[in-house]
Design a protein with these regions (language model features):
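Catalytic-face loop-and-helix region of soluble metabolic enzyme cores
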Residues: 3-14, 31-32, 232, 236-359
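Catalytic domains of carbohydrate-active enzymes, especially glycoside hydrolases
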Residues: 47-68, 189-198, 260-269
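N-terminal basic, low-complexity leaders that serve as flexible interaction/assembly modules and, when applicable
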Residues: 1-91, 224, 232-233, 319-327, ...
């Protein structure tokens, strides 16, 4: 049964019209704590960091940590409980029917501590007034690539039309994607249950690095099969739960990829990396899809690479260009703004400039 929408249909467009600027910056606040790794495992304290980030950045959006390890850790724990280091685990043979069965049977199992804290933090924020509680999850394709030792070769073979029954690498990719979808949907349902009104689904692997633009141009359905169809199923999960999709892809994208993500998946918000010229991408994006991004915050740590004055000028330029397009737009970071030891104040100054520079 489909639940009522948790947000007004124009919620993000209204924020864009009001000129909202916000980084994905909770990691900076987390690392101001004396024990950030302990905070990651404590839902109440993690919610405090999320709320403090929203207050500092003057945004109504409660944006969680972009920790894309959570779903993989839970999945590996479910199907390979003896694995000590899930971050580095890869399947060396295609996941079996038994693996898929274990993943389905684990639907109601407890989440690992970091994932549990993430869910508890969403619930804590959702219980407070004045903030829009967002969730965060890795996308199905990006999770699948993390389950393979050589995802590029596997996806390339699939893109050439090689069948799973003829090539173990293709079977490995297809089976891993099926497992990834189960893990992502389980996470999405849990985040909706916790109170998320929208979920940021991160698909950085949906890019020219992992999916061949040449194969797509030649008519291969590889992007459709491995990226778009799983994303559409994830969006349907969110739609059924009454929540919006914020689709984040900071990978290197072609024009065709941007157009497909925007028009086929049609998220409420499309967040892109700094390689894209958003004022040109408006021609590819439906008018009701808010563009989000895309200052090069991965370089904020270095004054040599990206001086403060350059951040100010980039901010002015992007805001001005996007205003001229009249397309709904929220100025933000190209990805999550990560804490870098010894560069914290440098990064914070640039984030503040991004938020305050007049245009």
């Amino acid at each position: 049964m489909t639940r009522p929408r948790r947000l007004a249909a124009d919620h993000f467009r209204a924020l864009a019209a009001a000129g909202l600027r916000t980084p994905i910056g909770t990691d900076l606040v987390l690392h101001e704590r004396s024990d950030p790794e302990a905070v990651r495992l404590d839902g109440r304290r993690l919610a405090g960091a999320v709320q403090e980030a929203a207050e500092r950045y003057r945004t109504p959006l409660a944006i969680p940590l972009m920790d894309l390890r959570l779903e993989k850790a839970d999945l590996v724990h479910c199907v390979r409980p003896g694995v000590a280091e899930p971050d580095t685990f890869h399947f060396d043979v295609p996941p079996s029917d038994a693996d898929l069965g274990r993943a389905r049977a684990g639907e109601g199992a407890s989440f690992l501590p970091a994932h549990r804290a993430h869910l508890d933090a969403i619930a804590e924020v959702a219980a407070r007034t004045g903030l829009t509680p967002l969730g965060m999850a890795i996308g199905p394709f990006s999770l699948a690539t993390k389950l393979l030792a050589d995802p590029i070769a596997a996806v390339a073979l699939a893109g050439r039309g090689v069948l799973a029954e003829d090539e173990p690498l293709v079977a490995l990719a297809e089976r891993s994607l099926a497992l990834a979808e189960l893990a992502v949907h389980r996470s999405l349902r849990a985040q909706l249950e916790a109170g998320a009104a929208a979920v940021i689904v991160c698909e950085p692997a949906a890019s020219a690095l992992f999916v061949s633009p040449r194969q797509i141009a030649q008519g291969s359905p590889v992007f459709e099969r491995f990226v778009l169809e799983p994303l559409l199923r994830a969006k349907a999960e969110l739609d059924e739960g009454g929540a919006d999709l914020v689709l984040h892809d900071c990978g290197e994208l072609t024009t065709a990829m941007v157009e497909a993500l925007a028009s086929r998946v049609r998220p409420a918000v499309l967040s892109l990396g700094s390689s894209r010229r958003l004022w040109e991408d408006v021609l590819l994006v439906p008018p009701d899809v808010v563009l989000f991004g895309n200052l090069p915050t991965k370089h904020f740590y270095s004054d040599e690479t990206l001086p403060l004055d350059s951040v100010r000028s980039m901010t002015r330029d992007l805001v001005t260009r996007m205003r001229e397009t009249a397309h709904p737009f929220i100025l933000s970071s190209e990805c999550d703004v990560l804490h870098v030891p010894e560069a914290g104040e440098t990064i914070r100054r640039k984030v503040e400039a991004m938020l305050t520079e007049a245009a």
